[in-house]
Curated annotation (Swiss-Prot):
EC number: 6.1.1.19
Location(s), subcellular: Cytoplasm
Name of the protein in question: Arginine--tRNA ligase
Keywords: Aminoacyl-tRNA synthetase, ATP-binding, Cytoplasm, Ligase, Nucleotide-binding, Protein biosynthesis
Subunit structure as annotated in this protein's UniProt entry: Monomer.
Family: Belongs to the class-I aminoacyl-tRNA synthetase family.
Origin species: Staphylococcus carnosus (strain TM300)
Motif 'HIGH' region in this chain: 130-140
Broad class of enzyme this protein falls into: ligase
Length: 554
């Protein structure tokens, strides 16, 4: 249990004990303490006096006074108590307890903030999963940044996390890709060939065709069906190699790359189909096979096998989720990050897992809303260089990996977001990622100066000299790090991390502007050096959750 939770729990226990000691109730109702919106109203506040009115048969103000009179302030770590309004009890803590976070951070270092108690829950997070038919764009970039950050947060909070990319390599879009590459191959070999109407016209397809013409001239002599099969596989291989490199450069990592074709090769689709039939959730109508998803809150049943006997795109997805739930000893939770165009897909997919006996609540789906790239107040839709949609690679080249990841994680995924590319490149306090990284670099500079004076961070410094209000506010932020991670994990909210980073950096800058770290007072200097080292560890670990670097020089 982290320091903040420990202090809060102790306060609750002491309030409960004082209620009993005052004879207000034999069975004490649950005591709730909240952080007041206005810091002037204390560190914590409780409404227990009003809750006890009917039980104690006294007015809440009298009850509050009785609780205060019987409270052991020393045990509760309370410095001052005020009764406000009809009977709210406001507690002002002795904030020296916060200094305990300094040696904890120094000792744990890279593990500071991580939950030491495992959740014993396996979570598989699937994100990006773009079709291997072209470059990644800004929507995929947001999905990558949010998915990777969410996975980092869940891991830090104690979940057993698996990160996965689903390769859609068995559908019609891959057939179109193969025909497109075949046409470009033939053109490169000197043959006049038209691209299919629904083909892919990107420059990368031209390059693949030219490359294959140079390296694999023998393909022109293969029978048509064999040739198309080769082009399918080579096309997917080329595109996936490019996507993997872009994602790796974007600090986005996966534990597994799951190919849709394996569902066919291993008979997973037929297995799941039989299971759903046995469970009574399929039926025949109009020459097609339907899945009875309306039994589980979908707005209509869904076709899974068409009249011609071919599968709809929905059936492999159903089989894929069955595989995910049952793989590696079984997953407790699946989290999917989908693009905004998949909103209508949520109910049918959640309904489908119910048909083979999985509680739909174990499948969580987050929708990534649209991102607009903005430059000089105008939306940028096309690349000036290529005339096509702006790619992830171009965004990384334009604003840098750190800025791209940070900006794309700053807002809740279910909200639309304008990405100001000019702001992302600014070296100013207005740029949130620069502001955060500058705090880290500034601490490095101070620690270097301290080291030159022979002063290094110490877990055994006398922290009682830390009394400055700005220093206490800074320590409060450090102490909130682990609870923030727990909250971000529980609510699947990566943007809470970037919000926290901004608050921590702001608290540090305010402290820095209000007091000096390096002075002639050796005891205070030692304490402050140790404190800002703890702040730096916290800032570095928080930035790492977002996949952003923590530079020592800027």
């Amino acid at each position: 249990m982290n320091i903040i939770d420990q202090v809060k729990q102790t306060l609750i226990e002491e309030i409960t004990a004082s209620v009993k000691a005052a004879g207000l109730a034999e069975e004490v109702p649950e005591v709730k303490v909240e952080i007041p919106k206005d810091p002037k109203n204390g560190d914590y506040s409780t409404n227990i006096a009003m809750v006890l009115t009917k039980i104690a048969k006294r007015n809440p103000h009298e009850i509050a006074q009785a609780i205060v009179d019987h409270l052991d302030k020393s045990k509760a770590n309370v410095e001052k108590i005020e009764i406000a309004g009809p009977g709210f009890i406001n507690f002002y803590l002795n904030n020296q307890y916060l200094t305990a976070v300094i040696p904890e951070a120094l000792e744990k270092d890279k593990d500071f903030g991580r939950n030491e108690d495992p959740k014993h829950q396996k979570v598989l997070v699937e994100y990006v999963s773009a079709n291997p038919t072209g470059d990644l764009h800004i929507g995929h970039a947001r999905n990558a940044a949010v998915g990777d950050t969410l996975s980092n947060i869940l891991d830090a909070a104690g979940y057993d996390v698996t990160r996965e990319y689903y390769i859609n390599d068995a559908g019609n879009q891959i057939t179109n890709l193969a025909h497109s590459i075949e046409a470009r191959y033939d053109q490169a070999m000197g043959k006049e060939t038209e691209l299919p109407a629904d083909g892919y016209y990107g420059k990368d397809i031209i390059n693949i065709g030219k490359d294959l013409a140079e390296k694999r001239p023998e393909l022109k002599d293969l029978p048509e069906d064999e040739r198309l099969k080769v082009f399918r596989q080579l096309g997917v291989d080329y595109e996936m190699e490019k996507l993997k490199k872009d994602l790796a450069d974007f600090n986005t990592h996966f534990d597994g790359w799951f190919s849709e074709t394996t569902l066919y090769d291993k008979g997973e689709i037929k297995k799941v189909l039989e299971l759903m039939k046995e469970n009574g959730y399929t039926y025949e109508a109009d020459g097609a096979t339907w899945l009875r998803t309306t039994d589980f809150n979908d707005d209509k049943d869904r076709v899974i096998i068409k009249k011609d006997g071919s599968y709809t795109y929905f059936l492999p997805d159903v089989a894929y989720h069955y595989d995910k739930f049952h793989r590696d000893g079984g997953q407790d939770i699946l989290i999917n990050l989908f693009g905004a165009d998949h909103h209508g897909y949520i109910n049918r997919l959640k309904a489908s897992v119910e048909t083979y006996g999985i509680d739909a609540d174990r499948l969580e789906i987050q929708i990534m809303q649209m991102v607009r790239l903005m430059q000089d107040g105008e939306e940028v839709k096309m690349s000036k260089r290529t005339g096509n949609a702006i790619t992830l690679r171009e965004i990384m080249d334009e604003v840098g990996i750190d800025a791209a990841r940070y900006f794309l994680t700053m807002r809740s995924p279910d909200t639309h977001f304008d990405f100001d590319m000019e702001l992302a490149k600014e070296n100013s306090a207005e740029n949130p990622v620069y502001y955060a990284q500058y705090a880290h670099a500034r601490i490095s500079s101070i620690l270097k100066q301290a080291g030159e004076r022979g002063i290094t961070p110490s877990e055994n410094a006398d922290f009682s000299v830390i009394t400055n209000d700005k220093a206490i506010d800074l320590l409060k932020k450090v102490a909130e790090f682990e609870p923030m991670i727990e909250s971000a994990a529980e609510h699947r909210a990566p943007h809470r991390v970037t919000n926290y980073i901004q608050e921590l950096a702001s608290a540090f800058h305010k402290f820095y502007n209000a007091d000096k770290v390096l002075t002639d007072d050796e005891k205070k200097t030692q304490a402050y050096v140790s404190m800002i080292a703890a702040v730096q560890i916290t800032l570095r670990n928080a930035l790492a959750l977002v996949g952003v670097s923590a530079p020592h020089n800027m």
